[in-house]
């Protein structure tokens, strides 16, 4: 009797949840976070580089991010990249260090960010459901090929469904936490 590889489905579902957490990290709330600048790429040395490859990013205060640029010649490029990243941030140069104050979010922007968070969560739910569908298809194939009995197929299908439910619950909890964080004034 063949045994379905449920662990691979669990890893794929975990990956969807982890991707969601990373996307949530990039959403700006009223608080400073180093992950806020993850989507920033700097034109440096003839190519586009992630900010963390040309500078050290820190959070000395809850509403301030500091960017310590390693190469003085890149300070202007880093400042421009942060300003043009569409994050609504305005860095101020202080020698080789950039200070990036995190402005208060207005209610309209908070609601907009909550919608974006909900969209990310829905994408993660779809990814988890796709993994579930793949698992169910594999179980049907194993049943059709005679590798497992109908009872075994039902048992494994219940396990795949339980995994799906657990991961959807994690996604919903992460969304609720992020929405609360975004809406907090």
From Swiss-Prot:
From what superkingdom does this record's organism come?
Bacteria
Q: Name one GO biological process term.
A: cytoplasmic translational termination
Molecular-function GO terms, alphabetical: ribosomal large subunit binding
Q: Which UniProt keywords apply?
A: Cytoplasm, Protein biosynthesis
Q: Name one GO cellular component term.
A: cytosol
Q: What's this protein's function?
A: Responsible for the release of ribosomes from messenger RNA at the termination of protein biosynthesis. May increase the efficiency of translation by recycling ribosomes from one round of translation to another.
**Entry protein name:** Ribosome-recycling factor
Q: Which organism is it from?
A: Rhodospirillum centenum (strain ATCC 51521 / SW)
Q: Upper taxonomic classification of the species?
A: Bacteria, Pseudomonadati, Pseudomonadota, Alphaproteobacteria, Rhodospirillales
What gene codes for this chain?
Answer: frr
């Amino acid at each position: 009797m063949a045994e379905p590889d449920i662990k691979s489905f669990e890893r794929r579902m975990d990956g969807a949840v982890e991707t969601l957490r990373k996307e949530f990290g990039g959403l700006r709330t009223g608080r400073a976070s180093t992950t806020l600048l993850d989507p920033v790429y700097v034109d440096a040395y003839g190519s586009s580089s992630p900010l963390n490859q040309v500078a050290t990013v820190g959070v000395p205060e809850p509403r301030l991010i500091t960017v310590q640029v390693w190469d003085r010649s890149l300070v202007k490029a880093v400042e421009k990249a942060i300003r043009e990243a569409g994050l609504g941030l305005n860095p101020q140069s202080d020698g080789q260090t950039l200070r990036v104050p995190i402005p208060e979010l207005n209610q309209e922007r908070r609601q907009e960010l909550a919608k974006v968070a909900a969209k990310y969560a829905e994408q993660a739910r779809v990814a988890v459901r796709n993994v579930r569908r793949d698992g169910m298809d594999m179980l049907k194939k194993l049943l059709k090929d005679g590798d497992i009995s109908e009872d075994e197929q039902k048992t494994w299908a219940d396990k795949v469904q339980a995994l799906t439910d657990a991961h959807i619950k994690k996604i919903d909890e992460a969304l609720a936490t992020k929405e609360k964080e975004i809406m907090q004034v």
